A protein has these predicted regions:
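Terminal, low-structured helical/coil segments at or just beyond the last alpha-helical repeat
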Residues: 2-12, 148-187
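N-terminal segments that cap or nucleate solenoid repeat domains
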Residues: 2-44
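Structural signature of tandem alpha-helical TPR/SEL1-like repeats
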Residues: 13-24, 51-60, 87-96, 123-137, ...
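Small-residue (primarily alanine) positions within well-ordered alpha-helices
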Residues: 28-29, 36, 41, 57, ...
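Short helix-capping/linker turns of helical repeat alpha-solenoids
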Residues: 30-33, 46-48, 53, 66-70, ...
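Hydrophobic face of amphipathic alpha-helices that form TPR/SEL1-like repeat modules
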Residues: 39-46, 73-82, 86, 111-123, ...
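TPR/TPR-like alpha-solenoid repeats
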Residues: 43, 64, 79, 100, ...
Length: 187
C-alpha cells in the first residue's frame, strides 16, 4: 500500500481553499521542494474519482525520489511493482525499494527484506546465504522502527539461520547508517 504523511494536506471545508492550497503546493514543487513534490504525488495517487492520476503521482514521486526522499522512493517502487502510472518492472521497483531502505524508510526496509528472503529460498539463485543475511538485516531494521510484520518475519527467518549468519546479520544491522536525503544536506 502506498503510504502517506497524515497531516500533509489539511482538509478544508471550501473548494476554493483546497484549490488555493494546491496552487501553493504546486508552486513550491515547481521550485524543487521535495516535500511539496511528495505531497503532490500523494494527492494524485490517493485521490478519488477523476482526480486520481497515477501518471501524475509517479511523475511527482520521481521528482522527490531523485532528491533522495525515502517515502517517495518507496511509493515509486510500489508503483513500478504494480504498474500504476508507469510500466510494471520488478527490477526498477526493487531499485527504488532499495534506495528507500538505504534512506531509512521502514517500509522499504521490510519490503527489501522480503525480496532478499525470496532470493534466499530460490534454489536457482546463487548466494542464498548472503541473501538470507541481508533479509535478516533489513527485517531487523524495519522491526526496530515498529514496522508491521517485520518482527515476526525477522523471528521466522532466524529459524533457518546458523549462529554465525545471525551474528553477521546483527553486525550489519548495527553498522547500518541511513543516508541523509539530498534535499536536507547542507552544501
Amino acid at each position: 500500500m502506498v503510504r502517506s504523511m497524515d497531516s500533509f494536506f489539511h482538509r478544508r471545508s471550501s473548494a476554493s481553499a483546497r484549490e488555493s492550497d494546491l496552487a501553493a503546493v504546486r508552486a513550491k514543487a515547481d521550485l524543487g521542494d521535495a516535500d511539496a513534490q511528495f505531497g503532490l504525488g500523494l494527492r494524485y495517487g490517493n485521490a478519488v474519482g477523476d482526480a486520481l492520476d497515477f501518471v501524475q503521482a509517479a511523475w511527482w514521486y520521481r521528482k522527490a525520489a531523485d532528491q533522495d526522499y525515502p517515502l517517495a522512493q518507496y511509493n515509486l517502487g510500489v508503483m513500478f511493482a504494480r504498474g500504476q502510472g508507469v510500466p510494471q518492472d520488478s527490477a526498477v521497483s526493487a531499485g527504488w525499494i532499495r534506495k528507500a531502505a538505504e534512506g531509512g524508510d521502514a517500509g522499504g526496509q521490510h519490503d527489501l527484506g522480503v525480496l532478499c528472503h525470496r532470493a534466499s529460498v530460490d534454489p536457482l539463485q546463487a548466494g542464498n546465504v548472503e541473501s538470507r543475511i541481508e533479509a535478516y538485516k533489513w527485517f531487523h531494521l524495519a522491526a526496530a522502527q515498529g514496522y508491521r510484520g517485520s518482527a515476526a518475519a525477522w523471528e521466522r527467518l532466524t529459524i533457518t539461520m546458523t549462529r554465525i549468519e545471525i551474528a553477521e546479520g546483527n553486525r550489519r544491522a548495527a553498522a547500518f547508517v541511513a543516508r541523509e536525503p539530498a534535499h536536507l544536506r547542507i552544501s
